[in-house]
């Protein structure tokens, strides 16, 4: 059983990285008609499209998006520090995405003045998006809280696999996920949505895929940490009501609504 659990832990990390790379050539296509046309051309297997159709940036197929690269930095920090060290994660993130990095281009300069010449898209190379730009500026200003307080995009969910894999089943898991998320996104809505996703991933890491994690009429017998043993980490936030249906999670009750 221990070997199976170890396989699921590794699988969560590798699976997230592979999925990110597989989707990268089709990243950020916001035009539904354009995306539908491309998918129709690709057939049933659009993964790892050889030619990028990304309208904002172009990277070689197999490379990560800005989200996958954040997950890599988080994984590296967790391994080197044998756990979450926010200060180390901040420094590694700054080095990976900051001055002199592959992400450091004139187009994605955090201090780039508005109203300049129109940028020709897509650019060659990775894209440094809003939360990372805000993070870099907060680091430059010497702030302790480095995350962007207005960004509520998908970063937290996309990069959570390493930290959930390390702390799955432990009382401090939610606390660690929140701390890692707030390094670049200091936004409550972003945090609570990420925590909900973390509970789903934790469930499957600990229990496998044989049992459904969705809404059920009977109590789940999965052995997950209950609320009395787990750090608060936004559990009672108003936005978490949609996550109450996760059996065995910190908010799970026998009627799928009872907060413990």
Task: Indicate residue ranges for each PLM-predicted region.
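Structured, active/binding-site neighborhoods that engage oxygen-rich ligands
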Residues: 1-260
